[in-house]
């Protein structure tokens, strides 16, 4: 579809509405299942340090499958790829429901999620264009965060009420997501005709990695989103252990409600980014990234529920404002160089490598007995410094460009 035709279409086209609905149900299932499965492994008396291992098994599938999922997203109609991926998530949820190993079941959900991600973001570049793409990303993030908000809370509350009911609801929601994908119009494959031999696919993927990491703008986007999502998933697990220590509450619902506050904030931040940031002014998001680390440090020292809610909403606002423009930048640049699906697969590799590293470090310090408040403070300080270094590095790169003779 030509860029002129896309520019003339309304943002909330039939295609866009179908994608947003499918994404909502899929993300709802992901988040409800995470907290229901965490409740299950607590009930089965797994040690505290095993909780991040659950997420590490999930993100490891992204890393292993990274060379293949981008080409799959670009080689087939993306709506159908999303449908099959949601079917794999449904299968993983059923594995857990039927009492098999929860780590195995959640890893199968990870396989579906790894295949789903390049397709869901890559399709945005096929149904929107130009500055609409930033707004489309904002709407995608809003849909995702609304699902995180409702799914996380539903998973925690249902798990406190009846654990098997919580797991059954997760499977049902994935089934609805599969059906919702049928309403996404079938679009032509973005890049058909590529080799499907694993060796050729791996070589093609690492060529895409090299091209994206060599370009200063896409490298900036990849580094920023990797740091953000690595920190975000670690914060989720930090909250599970922080709540009993700081607030004296030992249920499953409170950590999910606190995670929901971050989700509410991200919706607001994503909307602000769509309003105030364009592809030409992406660097406006960097101060928000530094402030995320500052706010996490302040949050870790709280013992008041109202202040915890307020600070997590602020963290979410800053997070939405930070990550949405970076996603849009990568999709726009990647679409014209390596294909949107490959670009998102490379992004997923970076983000999930960061998640695996941060979760592994977090699991280690918890196993070593570090106080959870001290872990939170250190985590916030390190994140703020990392984004500040990224900001300084990007500023230096820009200065070098302006000094080069034309």
UniProtKB/Swiss-Prot annotation:
Pfam family, one: MFS_1
Cellular compartment(s): Cell inner membrane
GO MF annotations in UniProt: lysophospholipid:sodium symporter activity
Membrane topology: Multi-pass membrane protein
Transmembrane segments: 16-36, 53-73, 91-111, 139-159, 164-184, 227-247, 253-273, 285-305, 310-330, 349-369, 372-392
UniProt keyword annotations, A-Z: Cell inner membrane, Cell membrane, Lipid transport, Membrane, Transmembrane, Transmembrane helix, Transport
Main function: Catalyzes the facilitated diffusion of 2-acyl-glycero-3-phosphoethanolamine (2-acyl-GPE) into the cell.
Annotated family: Belongs to the major facilitator superfamily. LplT (TC 2.A.1.42) family.
Protein name: Lysophospholipid transporter LplT
Species assigned in the record: Yersinia pestis
Gene: lplT
